[in-house]
Amino acid sequence: MAAPASVMGPLGPSALGLLLLLLVVAPPRVAALVHRQPENQGISLTGSVACGRPSMEGKILGGVPAPERKWPWQVSVHYAGLHVCGGSILNEYWVLSAAHCFHRDKNIKIYDMYVGLVNLRVAGNHTQWYEVNRVILHPTYEMYHPIGGDVALVQLKTRIVFSESVLPVCLATPEVNLTSANCWATGWGLVSKQGETSDELQEMQLPLILEPWCHLLYGHMSYIMPDMLCAGDILNAKTVCEGDSGGPLVCEFNRSWLQIGIVSWGRGCSNPLYPGVYASVSYFSKWICDNIEITPTPAQPAPALSPALGPTLSVLMAMLAGWSVL
């Protein structure tokens, strides 16, 4: 998650100026769902606690590490003991992430999920560690686009214990439009184009970008598919970065937070003119709900084991000149 220096892309100065003006003047819109329960927005996949309602209130200041309990649904996905991706808590047994985070290795025993974690080096009082029971990748993953269908459902072996630091997020679906939404991305990705990392969970406020402008920025209609959405602060050169993959993009609506996107791909942090591209949660919401409903709960649930954190974040990928997974 970085705010790199501005660069001039393939657009000319006049076209770029017009585009930036339109991005500022035109309020972004994105489809999202309003749940039918009183005073709650979005789909809740658990009945035990309210979704999207962190216990910590107040305004967040951009450019600083995220405070504890601000994003209680944040998950750290570990592969062979290292943080590689983010995710979000849906309910007591399910985590939402990106399919490409699990494509590298089909052996689910090598993956672990950490919740209630803010610092990758230090387990907090509410940090919990869970083993993976199964991973379900969307059937269209990489079918029509090199990184399309980039959604994964992760079922845990044991039940998540909710607390002020560990809570589920609400899911967005297509029934209601969010206009000029207050949206934030969170993760432990790179914090600069030089490859610097942070042990602290990072947060970044990002405006949503209308689909036509995202097509224009990427310069080719086939890059952005209907199952994707775009977000990025082009004027201030802010975007998600390598290592943020699978993490949530959430928007506030009536004091509830709806997850509208899953960090998926982009041109990398070195080129801020290209916004981050996210898997659209509203597009996949029915598939998510259907799979959670039909999948049996693991037998004999047991308490989570005590967390034992491995090395700090290690993002072992090169900055690609073209599009890349994040």
Swiss-Prot record:
Top enzyme class: hydrolase
Signal peptide: 1-32
Location in the cell: Secreted
Propeptide: 33-59
Main location: secreted
InterPro entries, per the entry: Peptidase_S1_PA, Peptidase_S1_PA_chymotrypsin, Peptidase_S1A, Trypsin_dom, TRYPSIN_HIS, TRYPSIN_SER
Highest taxon listed in the record's lineage: Eukaryota
GO biological process, one term: proteolysis
The keyword Disulfide bond appears for this protein: yes
TM helices/strands, residue ranges: none
Boundaries of every Peptidase S1 domain copy: 60-293
Record GO cellular component, one term: extracellular region
One GO molecular-function entry: serine-type endopeptidase activity
Glycan-carrying positions: N125
Gene3D superfamilies, sorted: Trypsin-like serine proteases (2.40.10.10)
Cystine pairs: C85-C101, C183-C251, C214-C230, C241-C269
Catalytic center residues: H100, D150, S245
The protein's Enzyme Commission number: 3.4.21.-
Entry keyword set: Disulfide bond, Glycoprotein, Hydrolase, Protease, Secreted, Serine protease, Signal
Pfam families linked: Trypsin
Family statement drawn from the similarity comment of this UniProt entry: Belongs to the peptidase S1 family.
Record's protein name: Serine protease 38
Native organism taxonomy: Eukaryota, Metazoa, Chordata, Craniata, Vertebrata
